[in-house]
Amino acid sequence: MAFTRSIALFAGLALAASSAQGATILGGYTQKNATSDDIELLTQATSSANMYNKNVDTRICLIAIENLETQTVAGTNYKFQVAGCPVETDDELGACDDRNCDYSSYNIVIFSQPWSDTIEVTSITPAEYQG
């Protein structure tokens, strides 16, 4: 039930946060409009602590998708910029229950390799604004 709620939440938010797709840069990140599959990947990966790389110690819940870029490697790196709130326990991962929390922007990088059934949150860092 919570998974379905999260998908519905992010589907609406992705429409508001979509941007034009850019040209592919070899080895670099490319802008991408978030699809329902991308939202499902984000929700699945960030809701389960066992999908986090052991070096990722930042834990957040998610409010909105602000941006998405992808990079083709030996699989795909998805760099989601999200609005989220820090959480204390793994039970709070996924969509934020308290949508009035003091949120910030974060970059979440998820590595996906479908043919080996690999999904891993490789980093969560505060987003840096370029201005």
Swiss-Prot record:
Its main location: secreted. Keywords: Glycoprotein, Protease inhibitor, Secreted, Signal, Thiol protease inhibitor, Virulence. GO terms for cellular component: extracellular region. Induction: Expressed during infection of host plant and in germinating cysts. GO terms for molecular function: cysteine-type endopeptidase inhibitor activity; peptidase inhibitor activity. Belongs to the cystatin family. This is Cystatin-like cysteine protease inhibitor EPIC3. It comes from Phytophthora infestans (strain T30-4) (Potato late blight agent).
